[in-house]
C-alpha cells in the first residue's frame, strides 16, 4: 500500500472573459488563473498489484455542501486514470475540504488536479494523456494540475504560464455564508456580449496590475443578480486600507481583494470579519 498526502490549492480568477459560445453550447473563455495557499488536503492510498481491484472509494470531510461519493470530480479523475494504470489496483481518496464548494474557487477542480498530478506521476502517464483526462473532468482542471499562475483560453485546454508575476501576493477572500452558485446556471444566463481576446505582449507580465484594470469578470453582474450580497462583499474589500483591486472569482460567490502588504491584508480580514460575522473571510497568499 502506498499513501500520499497532497494539497489542492484554491483557484482564483484574477480576470475572466467570455469570448465566444460554440454551437455545442460550450463557452470559450480567457482568464488569468492563480492559486492560493488555502488548500484542501487529500490522502490518496493505492493498493499493490496483488490487491483486489474494486471501484475507487472517495470520502469528503468538512464540506459545506453534501457531495456524492460516487459522482464527483475526484471519482471521475481516478476512474479515467485507472484506464492507464500499469496494474489493476484499488484507490481510496479522503478529501478534507477547507475551500468553500460551489463558490468560484475551483474546490472540486483542484481536488481532481491534485489526484491527476499524483497518480499520473506514480503510474508514469504521459502529460498529453493527463491533460486530456483533466479536460474531460472539467474546464478548470488542466490548470489545476500544476497550480501555477497561468493564462487560460478556449474551454480550458490552452495554457500559457506566467514567468514573471508582477503583483502583490497578499489577498483576502470573502463570501456570504450559505450562499452558493452553480457554474452552469451562471453561464446559462450570459447574454452574449462577448469580450474581445486580450493582446498579450512580451511586456504584459511586467505590469499585470495594468492588465487587471483593463479587464474584468464578465460573470460578475450575472452573479450579483442572483446573489446581491456579492456586491456588498466587493465594496467591503475595496474600502479597506491598502486595497489595490477587488472583484469576484469565477462564477461566484467568493470575492477577492489584493492588498499592498500582508499586514494590511490581515487587518482587512479582521475588520471585515468583525463587521460581517455571517461572512466567510480568509486572508491568504498567492502561490507564485
Swiss-Prot record:
Binding site for ATP: 100-110
SUPFAM superfamilies referenced in this protein's UniProt entry, alphabetically: GHMP Kinase, C-terminal domain (SSF55060), Ribosomal protein S5 domain 2-like (SSF54211)
Positions of transmembrane segments: none
Key words, A-Z: ATP-binding, Isoprene biosynthesis, Kinase, Nucleotide-binding, Transferase
Pfam family, one: GHMP_kinases_C
UniProt key word Acetylation: no
GO annotation terms (biological process): isopentenyl diphosphate biosynthetic process, methylerythritol 4-phosphate pathway; terpenoid biosynthetic process
Pathway membership: Isoprenoid biosynthesis; isopentenyl diphosphate biosynthesis via DXP pathway; isopentenyl diphosphate from 1-deoxy-D-xylulose 5-phosphate: step 3/6
Listed EC numbers: 2.7.1.148
Statement: the UniProt record of this protein carries the keyword ATP-binding: yes
Family the UniProt entry places it in: Belongs to the GHMP kinase family. IspE subfamily.
Protein name: 4-diphosphocytidyl-2-C-methyl-D-erythritol kinase
Protein source organism: Wolbachia sp. subsp. Brugia malayi (strain TRS)
Amino acid at each position: 500500500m502506498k499513501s500520499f498526502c497532497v494539497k489542492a490549492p484554491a483557484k482564483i480568477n484574477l480576470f475572466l472573459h467570455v469570448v465566444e459560445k460554440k454551437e455545442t453550447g460550450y463557452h470559450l473563455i480567457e482568464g488569468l488563473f492563480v492559486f492560493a495557499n488555502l488548500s484542501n488536503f487529500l490522502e490518496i492510498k493505492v493498493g499493490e498489484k496483488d490487491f483486489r481491484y474494486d471501484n475507487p472509494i472517495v470520502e469528503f470531510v468538512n464540506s459545506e455542501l453534501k457531495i456524492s461519493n460516487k459522482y464527483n470530480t475526484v471519482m471521475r479523475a481516478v476512474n479515467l486514470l485507472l484506464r492507464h494504470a500499469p496494474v489493476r489496483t484499488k484507490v481510496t481518496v479522503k478529501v478534507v475540504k477547507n475551500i468553500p464548494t460551489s463558490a468560484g474557487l475551483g474546490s472540486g477542480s483542484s481536488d481532481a488536479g491534485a489526484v491527476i498530478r499524483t497518480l499520473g506521476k506514480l503510474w508514469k502517464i504521459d502529460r498529453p494523456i493527463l491533460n486530456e483526462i483533466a479536460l474531460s473532468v472539467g474546464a478548470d482542471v488542466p490548470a489545476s494540475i500544476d497550480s501555477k499562475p497561468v493564462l487560460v483560453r478556449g474551454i480550458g485546454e490552452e495554457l500559457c504560464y506566467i514567468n514573471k508575476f508582477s503583483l502583490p501576493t497578499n489577498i483576502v477572500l470573502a463570501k456570504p455564508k450559505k450562499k452558493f452558485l452553480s457554474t452552469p446556471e451562471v453561464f446559462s444566463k450570459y447574454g452574449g456580449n462577448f469580450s474581445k481576446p486580450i493582446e498579450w505582449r512580451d511586456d504584459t507580465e511586467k505590469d499585470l496590475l495594468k492588465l487587471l484594470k483593463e479587464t474584468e469578470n464578465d460573470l460578475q453582474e450575472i452573479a450579483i443578480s442572483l446573489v446581491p450580497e456579492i456586491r456588498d462583499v466587493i465594496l467591503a474589500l475595496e474600502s479597506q486600507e491598502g486595497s489595490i483591486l477587488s472583484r469576484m472569482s469565477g462564477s461566484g460567490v467568493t470575492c477577492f481583494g489584493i492588498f499592498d502588504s500582508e499586514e494590511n491584508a490581515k487587518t482587512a480580514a479582521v475588520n471585515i470579519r468583525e463587521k460581517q460575522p455571517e461572512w466567510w473571510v480568509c486572508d491568504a497568499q498567492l502561490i507564485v
